């Protein structure tokens, strides 16, 4: 075949292939993205419905007619020859659009380029749910998760409108309904065209909302009453107030003398319950009070250097923080008053007594008891009461003063707190607790095993609308924080066999002594009763014999109680017998019996004190004997050759040796040595060896030789020489 005809044939075949490619419909490149978007929209709607059904189980939500395209669907991928996949239950409009697109573009080929057939996306299979079966399984999983994990309880308290706010013409923008719902209304200007279409009313729902007429006792009983009971059982609890400056946080936590706050009421309730439970065990209450001021931790009960935060297995600990043991409510009130005096409060633009620091009051309750096997059971509960400083906005005209620096540090710590709340809500692995000292101290309260209560304080004034909206927003976010289920902090200390035997022996001895003392007390009571009966019988016999009661009076009143005039002038009238009726006799006898019983009880107490002292002396003797035994064993282990090499140093060994043929005078023992052989004292040695004494410049005074005066110091081994006159 000639070359020309061959080229013509090849061109003709190439043109035919291009024509066939042109006739084929092309694939839409955006078809896969559309399928993914539909699947994600479907998943979002299903998750939204599931969460709504969990929050409101009694609410039956009926699907809207226009939302039929978001029904649960499954891909029909059984046919391999299909060019596109249809979703069951689609509207006709969506089917027509897909058919139009697929008529124009082929699903497997792109113009001019051969491609691999597109596999149906597996995302839709995973995300689509059929007939609500998986909704039920996910709901069960969420219920089981909620049973094992608790959340933070969030409460909102609205303060009343202030006098200055009324004078400035501010309006109330917050309304509390049904003690749960909070409605926030924004008052805008008609000339503010940018905010005309903005949503004016916002609705929030919390665990409980307190209007401005709520008392302090109602707030405490609703928010913190159950936490105190849990702390006594060995669990951890924390309460903190959040809000803008001037919203009433310090009033809610501390209160006044007439209306005490949550801290004071919690302490009173705690000690009242401790007194009720102290019969079956031993309760110990420790107290500490600290503040975070400008990112430094201070001790309010004993001010001094800043404290350092350290972390161990038990949690965040402030090194050097003093803990006071409290025995009564009055002691705690005195400590609180002293700590509040040391707290940093300064007047600001919004509040005359604004808190410039975050205050944290920690109350640790330890309960110890013994079980049947004499093991010590220890339960420790911690209650943290936190008063946060208020966030405030700095004006552009404010100078860089101390107040502005304090406000910047407060806002920085509250920003770190809000970032921790965001991370906890979103379920992130890393929670930025170390961004601030405040979040480090609140680590156990936010993400640990702790029952946490948040009280959001808001202002009703329309002038502080932004701060109120921000506080309600973060409080609504904090509702979603999940914390671990709080377990009982219980520790069982098992007593060793030897210690257990000694303690059991001591317990048996004390029980035996107690039983013996009880027997003696019963005998004394029996004797007392017999004496009383004999006295009453004798008195009755004397009354029957004669009407005069001198015998009865002599029995009832001791002779020392009679005055001199009564001894000189005894009464013999018949009317005197009416002074001693049987009722008065019984009364006096009962008084005597009570006095004798008091004497016996006093004697028994003295005997018990004596036995305790003897027991203490005996334990001390045993301890001394044990120490002597240990010392003797240690001395026996030392080698004997050390004893031989020991040298006893005395004053005689330190004296200079006597020269031969030296005459001894009678006053040799009492005279000091010769001046030439005089010993040099410490000060002479140090002065002579100093560099200035060696290198200093000689003058005329140095050339003169001065005779040294004899030292008046008492030399070792010699007596003071006699003074010559």
From Swiss-Prot:
Which Pfam family, just one, is annotated for this protein? Kinesin
The protein's UniProt keywords, in alphabetical order, are: ATP-binding, Coiled coil, Microtubule, Motor protein, Nucleotide-binding
**Record field: compositional bias (Basic and acidic residues):** 655-665
Q: Is-annotated flag, keyword Coiled coil?
A: yes
Ranges for domain Kinesin motor: 151-481
- Record's signal peptide: none
Q: Name one GO molecular function term.
A: microtubule motor activity
Residues covered by region (Disordered): 1-32, 652-672, 691-725
- List the GO terms this entry assigns under cellular component, sorted alphabetically: microtubule
What the entry lists under SUPFAM superfamilies is as follows: P-loop containing nucleoside triphosphate hydrolases (SSF52540)
Cross-referenced Gene3D superfamilies: Kinesin motor domain (3.40.850.10)
Coiled-coil segments: 499-541, 583-617
**A GO BP entry:** microtubule-based movement
What residues bind ATP, as annotated? Answer: 243-250
**PANTHER family in alphabetical order:** CENTROMERE PROTEIN E, KINESIN-LIKE PROTEIN KIF19 ISOFORM X1
Q: Which family does it belong to?
A: Belongs to the TRAFAC class myosin-kinesin ATPase superfamily. Kinesin family. KIN-8 subfamily.
The protein, known as: Kinesin-like protein KIN-8A
Q: What is the originating organism of this protein? A: Arabidopsis thaliana
């Amino acid at each position: 075949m000639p070359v020309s005809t061959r080229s013509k044939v090849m061109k003709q075949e190439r043109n035919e292939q291009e024509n066939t490619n042109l006739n084929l419909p092309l694939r839409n490149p955006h078809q896969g993205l559309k399928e993914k978007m539909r699947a994600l929209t479907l998943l979002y709607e299903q998750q939204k419905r599931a969460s709504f059904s969990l929050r409101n189980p009694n609410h039956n939500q009926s699907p809207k007619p226009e939302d039929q395209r978001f029904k649960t669907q499954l891909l029909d991928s059984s046919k391999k020859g299909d060019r596109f996949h249809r979703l069951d239950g689609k509207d006709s409009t969506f089917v027509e659009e897909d058919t139009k697109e697929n008529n124009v573009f082929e699903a497997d080929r792109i113009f001019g380029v051969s491609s691999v057939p597109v596999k149906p996306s597996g995302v839709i299979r995973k995300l689509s749910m059929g007939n609500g079966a998986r909704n039920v399984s996910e709901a069960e999983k969420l219920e089981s998760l909620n049973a094992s994990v608790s959340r933070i309880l969030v409460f909102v308290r609205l303060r009343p409108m202030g006098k200055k706010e009324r004078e400035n013409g501010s309006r109330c923008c917050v309304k509390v309904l049904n003690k749960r719902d909070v409605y926030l209304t924004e008052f805008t200007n008609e000339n503010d065209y940018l905010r005309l279409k903005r949503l004016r009313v916002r609705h929030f729902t919390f665990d409980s909302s307190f209007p401005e007429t709520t008392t302090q006792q109602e707030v405490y009983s609703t928010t913190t009453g159950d936490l105190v009971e849990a702390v006594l059982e060995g669990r951890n609890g924390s309460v903190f107030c959040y809000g803008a400056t001037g919203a009433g946080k310090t009033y809610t936590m501390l209160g006044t003398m007439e209306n005490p706050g949550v801290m004071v009421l919690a302490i009173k309730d705690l000690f009242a319950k401790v007194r009720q439970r102290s019969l079956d065990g031993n309760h110990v209450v420790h107290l500490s009070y600290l503040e975070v001021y400008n990112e430094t931790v201070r001790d309010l009960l004993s001010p001094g250097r800043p404290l350092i935060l350290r972390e161990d297995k038990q949690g965040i600990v402030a090194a050097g923080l003093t803990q006071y043991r409290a025995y009564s409510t009055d002691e705690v009130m005195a400590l609180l008053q002293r700590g509040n005096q040391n707290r940093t409060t300064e007047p600001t633009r919004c509040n005359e007594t604004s808190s410039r620091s975050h205050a944290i009051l920690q109350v640790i309750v330890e309960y110890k008891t013994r079980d049947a096997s004499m093991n010590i059971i220890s339960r420790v509960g911690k209650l943290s009461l936190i008063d946060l400083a208020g966030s405030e906005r700095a004006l552009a005209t404010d100078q860089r003063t101390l107040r502005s620096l304090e406000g910047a540090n407060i806002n920085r710590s509250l920003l770190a707190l809000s970032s921790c709340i965001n991370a906890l809500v979103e379920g992130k692995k890393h929670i930025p607790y170390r961004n601030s000292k405040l979040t480090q101290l609140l680590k156990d309260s936010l993400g640990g095993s702790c029952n946490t209560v948040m009280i959001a304080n808001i202002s009703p004034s329309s002038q502080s609308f932004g701060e109120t909206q921000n506080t309600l927003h973060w409080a609504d976010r904090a509702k979603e924080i999940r914390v671990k289920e709080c377990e009982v902090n219980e520790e069982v200390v098992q007593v060793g066999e030897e210690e257990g035997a000694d303690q059991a022996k001591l317990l048996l001895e004390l029980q035996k002594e107690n039983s013996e003392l009880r027997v003696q007390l019963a005998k004394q009571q029996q004797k007392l009763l017999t004496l009383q009966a004999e006295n009453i019988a004798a008195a009755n016999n004397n009354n029957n014999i004669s009407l005069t009661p001198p015998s009865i009076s002599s029995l009832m009143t001791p002779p020392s109680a009679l005055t001199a005039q009564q001894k000189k002038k005894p009464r013999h009238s018949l009317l005197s017998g009416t002074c001693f009726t049987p009722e008065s006799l019984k009364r006096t006898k009962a008084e005597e019996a009570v006095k004798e019983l008091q004497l016996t009880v006093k004697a028994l107490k003295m005997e018990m004190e004596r036995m305790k002292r003897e027991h203490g002396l005996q334990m001390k003797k045993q301890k001394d004997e044990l120490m002597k035994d240990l010392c003797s064993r240690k001395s026996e282990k030392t080698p004997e050759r050390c004893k031989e090499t020991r040298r006893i140093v005395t004053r005689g060994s330190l004296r200079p040796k006597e020269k031969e043929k030296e005459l001894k005078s009678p006053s040799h023992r009492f005279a000091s040595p010769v001046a030439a052989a005089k010993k040099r004292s410490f000060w002479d040695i140090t002065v002579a060896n100093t560099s200035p004494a060696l290198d200093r410049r000689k003058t005329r005074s140095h050339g003169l030789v001065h005779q040294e005066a004899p030292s008046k110091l008492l030399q070792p081994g010699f007596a003071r020489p006699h003074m010559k006159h």
